[in-house]
Amino acid sequence: IINIFCEKDDRIKPVFLEKNIGPSGARNIAMQKSSGRYIAFLDSDDVWDPYKLEKQISFMEYNNIAFSYTGYQVISEDGNIRNSIIKVPALITYHDYLKNTIIGCLTVILDKTQIGDLKMPDIRTSQDMAFWLLILRNGFSAYGLNESLAKYRVVRDSNSSNKIRAVKDVWFVYREIERLNLFYSLWCFINYIFYALKKRIL
């Protein structure tokens, strides 16, 4: 399938890995080898709106934004929509994101000329959460385009479908990656649970 698309568009440059190096390793290699200005993320089971890149990059260029994200919807394994549009705030800072991990990886676009050569932390899960925090901790803010431009597919037995594992991973990022003290970790965690429940209910 990849070769078919490569024949149609020479801008597509596949990178084949000899062994499984995990999501963060694969994404870091892809970012390193990319020659364009903008970086976007899309896993094989997720879906973009046909005009996502055009709309989002125009939004970034007009506002001189380094880090942007959009709204999205969650779909089931067979493609049925599971909830309403997940609306996103216009701005997220480092401390905002610690409490509300609403940024969907499949919606993010980064401007490499501003972000630089930051790498996704090499951890087992929640690599994207740790990466967004790394960028935000380096002085950037993330800006939201409140329009549903992607669909996130929840696959059975995946990390995202395992809520207990997800909760443990968030706590791991707080304590082991961000080195937050216990009390601030608890405060952020309470907020994280609140926003996670709110996202599932609405």
What role is predicted for each listed range?
Residues 32, 88-165, 169, 173:
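Conserved nucleotide-sugar donor-binding catalytic segment
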Residues 39:
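Short aromatic/hydrophobic "clamp" motif used to bind/position activated sugar donors
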Residues 151-202:
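Hydrophobic helical membrane-anchoring modules
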Residues 43-47, 71:
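The conserved acidic donor/metal-binding loop of glycosyltransferases
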Residues 17-34:
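Glycine-rich, basic loop-to-helix element that forms the pyrophosphate-binding segment
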Residues 51-82:
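Conserved donor NDP-sugar-binding/catalytic core segment of glycosyltransferases
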Residues 1-16:
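Acidic donor-binding segment of Leloir-type glycosyltransferases
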Residues 23, 27, 52, 106:
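Conserved donor sugar-nucleotide recognition element shared by glycan-biosynthetic enzymes
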